[in-house]
Amino acid sequence: MKHIVIIGAGYAGMAATARLARRVKGRDDVRVTLVNPQARFTERLRLHQAASGQRLAELQIPDMLAGTDVEFVQGWVTGLDADARTVRLDDERVIGYDTLVYALGSVADTEAVPGVDEFAYTLNSAHDAGLLAQELDRLGAGTVVVAGGGLTGIESAAEIAERHPELDVVLLSRQTPGSMMGPKARARLHAGLARLGVRIRSGVDIVKVMPDGVALADGEVVPAGAVLWATGVRVSPLAAAAGLRVDERGRIITDAALRSVSHRDVYVVGDAAAVRQGYGLVHGTCQSGIPTGVHAAANIVRELKGKQPKRFRFGYVHQPVSLGRHDAVIQFTHPDDSASRFYLAGRWAVAYKETVSASPWTTYRLLKLLPALGAVTWRRGGGFTR
């Protein structure tokens, strides 16, 4: 009997699981096991909302898997033996596999700058976001530093400022927030942040995080009652330790079909994968993660049928950014994620962003119910492909 094991139930891992669940249901020659530390699904697209004190729905992975033949195992993966084809859990259980889907994702890089791990908050989980929310309520007034001008930093700063108008929210960034957008969308983004009272300071480097603020490279100290670290991510060292070929950031290098180039029985999806397209490497987002999960699952099904796996091709569509609950900016993009001349802002953008944030769970349900959905087309290089 073939045993397919998926480690990690983020956006990409859940997509692979849901796709496989429908395709192998009722088969007595295939087992599918999903391993994840928590039974609760982490909506990373909404963690900035949780950080500001909003309650999120508690989506349960076992509920999603109900009615399928997928086995859910709760536990932390602490070791991988790629040659023996086994994964080890924190309770010393060992699970063997014939095919592995590696979907361990990424977390905030708290090791690159001194003090981050000790004194900064992160958005790695709903629990982490809840800790920051409690601290913001405790502060009452004061300054909150959000480090990082990417999508997570922008959305977090906006959400905190809207929910806590008594706080002075400072967004510190090496680059201009919204630098990936076109000039009109970027100007609209900055106007939205200014309306909420967010102070932007770009072109700065944080060299140390302290209990009461952050130190910049030029010697300035920015006082803060709380610091949210939203710049830079790192992947699990498990892959490198197991001997899988990885790039300089520790991501597993894949072939065109999303298999590890060093271990063809390992498919890699989401943030943990170094997937190359014609325009360069795919960067880790939910937008690209779900397609990698669906495609890897489809290729596994093809291999079960004795067919060759297909090449993965993908192009980006948009950069959706919420600015609190009442404003948003959507930058539409070319397939390589560069900004097009089209963007959306205001209430229609709010509705668009909410649809994007809510779509993964619905997508998993549809993948579980409708086999044909796994053959959806992903945008690529000005065209579409299966």
Where are these regions (language model features)?
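Short hydrophobic core segments
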Residues: 7, 35, 95-108, 214, ...
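FAD-site-proximal beta/loop scaffold in flavoenzymes
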Residues: 118-140, 221-226, 230-291, 298
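Conserved N-terminal glycine/acidic-rich loop preference
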Residues: 1-13, 37-55, 103, 118-153, ...
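C-terminal auxiliary extensions adjacent to catalytic cores
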Residues: 325-386
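Internal hydrophobic alpha-helix adjacent to the cofactor/substrate pocket in enzyme cavities
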Residues: 17, 287-314
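FAD-binding core/adjacent interface of flavoenzyme oxidoreductases
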Residues: 1-3, 69-143, 228
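A Rossmann-like FAD-binding core segment of flavoenzymes
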Residues: 71-79, 95, 163-256
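Beta1-alpha1 glycine-rich phosphate/pyrophosphate-binding loop at the start
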Residues: 1-71, 155-183, 228
